[in-house]
Structures are given as C-alpha cells and as structure tokens.
Amino acid sequence: MFHLGYSQVSDHPIKNLKQTIIILLCFLSIPSYAQTSLTLSSYDLPPYIGQELKDQGAVHEIVEAVLAEANRTVDVVFFPFTRAVNSALAGQYQAVFPVTYDDLLSKGFLLSNAIASYQLGLLGRKNDDSSLEKISEKTTIALVRGSISEQEGNSFAPARFVYVAQNEQAMRMLQSGRVDYVLIDKFTAADLMVDKLPYMIGLFAFPEQFTKKVDLHLAFSKKYIGAKTDLDAFNSALKRLESQGVIDAILNRHGLLFFENTSEEKVIRIATVANGDMVLMQRISAEYEQLHPGITLDWRVLDESILRRRLLSDLAISEGQYDVMTIGAYEVPIWNKQDWLSPLTDLAVEYDQNDMIDVVRDSLSNRGDLYALPFYAESSMTYYRRDLFEQAGIEMAAVPTWDNIRTYAKKLHAPEQGVYGICLRGKVGWGENIPIVSTMVNAFGGQWFDMQWAPQLNSSVWHQSVSFYVDLVSAFGPPDTHENGFPENLKLFSEGHCAIWIDATVAAGMLFDAKRSAVADKVWFAPAPVAETSKGSAWLWVWSLAVPSSSKLQDEAKEFIAWATSKDYINLVAELEGWVAVPPGTRKSTYENANYIQAAPFAEYVFSAISSANPEDATLPNSPYSGIQFVTIPEFTAIGNFTSQQINAVLRNKKTVDEALSQSQAFTVELMKHVRASQ
C-alpha cells in the first residue's frame, strides 16, 4: 500500500504532510487580523511558478491578478516546499500556494477554487499497444519521494513504487529499462527532457488512460482570522477573471493553455511566435476562414522562447497538440530526421518553389523535398540613428567592427535624455541572447565545438567575446538588458531610446514604417559588426510553417501554410499594410518588385545578406557542425538554453564571466558524454 511516513518526507512540492500537520496544529500561533495587504508563502514548481520564470510563472501571475481584482495587495516569499506550507500553517503567512487537495491538508487550511491544474500521469516508452496495458503487481513506477498524496498514489495500485530523490534520476531509470513508468507532470517531464535530457525526446509518451488532471489551489491558513473573508473575495474575483478570459490569457502567455476538445471537425490548431509579422498573419487569416467556411483556425501566439519550449516539449512526450508549427532553420533538419514533419510534396505549380531564395529553400529541404514553408527569413545587421551620429560628429563605418560599435555607443550614451548607447538582446533563451553572443564569438574567431566535438566554451575566445558583450551592455545599454529580447528592443529603438541596435533584418520593415516607428526618418543601417573575421558575424534564420506528422488534418493544414507563405499573401499584406510591411527574405520576386524596392531602402542589403549566408562555413577555425548562431544537433537546445541562463546571470551580477563559462563548459561536456553513452 502506498504510504508516506514523516521520516520519508523530502523537501518536494506535492506531498503528504499528515504527521507534520498534526504536530503543527498543536503549536499554532496567535491569529492575525484581516488585512488588505497579504503576505503569502510559495515555492518553485516550474514551469508553473518559480523565481527564475518570466513574471515568476503563470500561477504567481494568476494569484496576483485575482487578489488585485479583490482589492488586495500581495507580497510573495519563496521557500522550499515544506517550509512554505509549514510557515503558513503556523500563521506566519496568511496563505500558501500552489497546493493540491488533501484531506489532511484541509484540516489546517481553507482551499480556494482551482487556480490552475497540471496533468499527472505515467510516462512510459512508446508502445503501439499502450492502450491495452494495465497496472499490475509487476508494474514498477519511479517517482520522487513525497511527490504525491496517499490518495493519488492509491489510484495506481497495485503497482510497486520505486522512490528517488529527483525526477531526472527517475527518467534515467526509465531510459535504462529499470522501471516501467515515471509518475510525473506532463510539462515537468517535457521541460526536463528539453533542458537536460534531449536525447530522450520522442522516446516516451503518456498513455491517456494513466493521465489525470490535478487542480492547484491557494490555501488560506485557518489560523488567519481573515481567512474566510479573503477566501470568499478571492473566489469571487477568480470567477470574474475567468469569465473575462483573463486566466486563460495568462496561461496562454506562459504556454500552459491546452486546446479544448471541440465537436467541430476541422479546427486547425496553430502555434506561432508573438512577432509583428505573425500577429499580422493571425489578423489577416480571418480572410482565409471566410474563403474556407468549413475551417476554423485556433491560435496560440507565444513568446519566442516559450514557443520553442512548448513545441519541442509537445514532441518530447508525443502529445500531438498542433496542426501547424512555427519553426526555424534549426528544427527542420533535425525534426525531419525523426519523422516528426510531413513532407510538402504536393504544392501547386503556382506556389512557385523556384521563387524561393536558394539558401532559404535549402535550409528547409531534405533531398529536394520541402518540410516547411518559409514565412520570413532574416540575417542580422546594425541599425543606428543617423541624427544622433550627425549631432555627435561621428560617422558609421561601412563595415563596423565591435570596437567601433563600443566607441559609438560610449559617445552616444545619454540615459538622462532617455537614449541608451546600444541595445542588445539579454533575455534567457537559445534564440534570445545566444544569437548575438554566438555571432560575436564567431566574429572574434571562436566556435562551439572543435573538430573532435570538444566543447570550447571555456576557451580564451569565448571569455573575450562574452566579457566584451557584458561590459558593452552594462556600460552603455538599458539597465534591464537581461529582460530584453527582440520585441523589447524593437520597441525601445522604434520609440527613440536606442542609438544603436544590432539584431534581425526583419526589424527593418517595422523601423522604416512611419506608422509603426517614431524614428522612421532617422534610422539607417550597416552590416553586423565584425572583429577578427567576418565569417559567421551575421546570422541566418528562417521562421517557417510546418505540419507535424501527428496532425489529423494534414491536407487542411498544408493548404493553410501554402496560403500564408504564397505570393498572393505577400500581395495581400502589401495591399492592406503597404509594401514596407510585407514578410521579407523568402522570395526573389519580392526583391524584384519595384514597389518593394521603393518602399524598402534596405531591400538590396537584406537580400544580399541572406543570399550570401553560409551555415556550412561559419567559423574561422574548422567546425564539425553546420549553423551560424546555433549548432544543428538535437542537444543544442539544452546547451544553448543553459549557456544563455549563465550569461544572463552575469548580466544580473549573480555570476562572473569565468563562472558562467566554466559551468556552461561542464554542463556541455557532461551532456555530450550521456549522448555518446545512449547511442
């Protein structure tokens, strides 16, 4: 029988607190009086809540929003799980969150209505007969000790539980065949694979019959005298925000909103990135629905890093949520090898594949067959304020070096006037701060791996490059550089707060558009900076639309992505928004169009930068990999994300450059060791 005694309790989020609660109920503190300002205890439970998550996670944001709606202000203090619960139980904090329902827990707390939920299930190896499997005495299930209540454990009887200290340990046991299943939340398992165990992606799945929804609650301590009043106010406010769609919007923003089951037969479920061109596509797609009355489009528009994580995590646990995925030049060759993408071999003649820019088409193809269709493509370049340069009496070099950029940024940095010398990406993510750091490393003569696949993250070139980057943005960038990615810097520059910005060429269409930019008549451009070499100093990326092989609406999804990436779509955007706003970088015909050339003074440069990019030869020393700002291996998402986190910590003064790079090197060495062992 499943049971947790007090001696077994570990410091883990969801656990049986039976004996702890009994003891603490005997030593309760003096009640406090009802307050409009609340102090709550919580703990890290990624991806739902955590001190390192964006806005501290969806659950944190929901609780803050609900209490604000209830006219309460709130301060949240993070502890390890046991201390978070015990502190609230003892009356030191008015409430704790998130918790799951438990008979024992309810003796010391008043639980709110559900604020969110997670999907608890058994993760096992992919098996065509998994739907026929049953739990028996021979079934072995690994789980973190204390991670579920006795009630939840009983639902998996008569299986034998194998207790471990960490989910990562349980996952390795599953991979080696030492257990049949791991009992774990879906998103937790998926994120673990994405971040630390990428070689396990696609090997496992959650059989539907062994998965259930578990609600999360805010729990008010019964020793807080205002508990009942605040509980009622919280539940009422929660209900109002739910009816207004606020809760779903928060969950969606964090990539935690599942698609609803629908009786409609043809709902195309689309995941895309919250960039301007994609948001415009979503708006214009209403015309597509009018032309296809039997089709409904259901969108998830997400932050770039969250999109990447949710798409890969969907594949990691074989969920199959999406019909259309927005992916890039990194994913296509890797996912194609795993048979995760449907080939696009039946495109109509008028689609005109030969009109695609060669390097763009090649990056999305295998043996001549396309596996994704390009929505827009980009390189990187330097944007700068001509007016500020003229006022300072300086001139942008025809091909600037990074030393030039530092000199300019120092001269133009005027934060007291609301202008920063330079804006660069600093946000965590292999697609956020890594592209700028990686191309800088290339320019300084470095690489991710040498020809023997030995990681180079602790090399002198990496130290030089990252130190230069950190010093540059710390001295002459916005104080919140560590929070800024593409959209944040686009906003800063377009509103006149950056003298220099080095980022994607796709931003040019927005910066030169007077309807969307306050500096449209003041901005100009130059190539991305170089240093020891120009090789790999500017990146190549292709945001594209693909249909996963798991989609049940193959034909419908393919028809939609063909429409969204067609010449007709480009003409439609030009008609509605102007030629400067059309998705760039994909079709030769766009750059042959006199209307586009007239509207986009950057057109010739962007076409040349994209066309000349060479992902096969992007580093000064020979490298065993393809890719400019990324390495085209499955493990790079984990390596890039980890390295990104360490560099971000340096920007926040939490680590030194030496610490960040030595830890990144150690992580990469260990990961590649596991990869070789698993092959």
Predicted regions and their residues:
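Extracytoplasmic "Venus flytrap"/periplasmic binding protein-like
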Residues: 109-116, 287-358, 363-365, 391-393, ...
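C-terminal lobe and pocket-closing loops
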Residues: 153-157, 507-518, 531-641
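Acidic, polar ligand-binding/catalytic clefts
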Residues: 64, 76-136, 145-149, 204-211, ...
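Extracytoplasmic/periplasmic solute-binding protein
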Residues: 371-375, 380, 406-455, 498
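Glycine-centered hinge/linker elements that transmit conformational signals in sensory
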Residues: 408-411, 451-483, 524, 528-529
